[in-house]
Amino acid sequence: VKSSISEDDVIGIPYLFRSEKELPELEKLALTHCQGKTLDVGAGSGCHSIILKEKGIDVTAIDISKGAVEVINKRGVHAECINFFDVQEKYDTLLFLMNGLGLSGDLDGLSEFLKKAKSLLNTNGQILLDSSDIKYMFEEDDGSVWVDLNRSYYGEVTYQMEYKDLTTDKFSWL
């Protein structure tokens, strides 16, 4: 993982294929609140979708990675290769885990992201999402935080993913 704010990082393959026991408490809690027809957005390997399916939830996983969608389908969950902003069907629960709010790209995209999400909800539907405050990356030894106020919001990050000889285009993440 390459980013505009830190050294290169590695996400181990086992982390992407976690069991329910291995999930952070926040993700476990979110999964307990899923109900009805559920859309797992940015599903990756499908670890959340698989857990939901095992609990009897009607779940569809989506991701823009064809490879990820193939993996999810092979794991027995219905998955589609589609961009969230192209989804038309309505759902009772929209699930955006592992910093899912980041799909908005930046603060300017947040309003459009939330409007799209709302448009996909059935009556009394819900949006379950998480995000991370990366302020800790700017903390000084004395506990103060140094942020350049003349630049864009510090939570707007550019990423690029690499795996073996494959490299994604750079993308914005909130």
Identify the function of each model-found stretch.
Residues 1-33:
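S-adenosyl-L-methionine
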Residues 33-44:
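Conserved class I S-adenosyl-L-methionine
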Residues 45-56:
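Conserved SAM-binding loop of SAM-dependent methyltransferases across substrates and taxa
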Residues 65:
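Conserved SAM/SAH-binding beta-strand->alpha-helix loop
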Residues 73-86:
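Conserved SAM-binding strand-loop segment of SAM-dependent methyltransferases
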Residues 90-111:
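A short SAM/SAH-binding and catalytic strip from SAM-dependent methyltransferases
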Residues 111-123:
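A short glycine-rich, Lys/Arg-flanked "PGG" loop and its adjoining helix->strand segment in the class I
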Residues 123-174:
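SAM-dependent methyltransferase
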